Amino acid sequence: MAVSRGFQDFILDLLRPLDPVSRRMFSGVGLFHGGVMFGLLVRDILYLRVDETTREQFERAGSSPFTYQRGEREVSLSAYYVVPEGLLDQPDALLQWTRNAIAAARRSASSARPATSRSGVRQYRRTRNADSG
């Protein structure tokens, strides 16, 4: 599942206006913006983050989710879809799809964070103190 240096450089050059950060991950490369992962490079294929808001757009364009082999079975990671065919030849369109992927990654990150509130913290402390006393 390696990524060639040439493909990685090509994608980073296309996405340069968005100032992405790339990090090696296993045998692929993760693409980050503002602390959230919005893309994945695996086997010289670009995958972008989707959510319930953007998934249909990718499916209408004929894209499919990221899949990989794990032993005898195929695993599908439905949060990342392959970039639609021909999009790498349309830099402006690719940037818009990537902006949508960054927005999807942010929405997913914010919904995944546990809600915290001072009253919840106080309640926990009261309960904990009552149990120990």
Predicted regions and their residues:
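Charge-dense, helix-prone N-terminal extensions
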Residues: 1-133
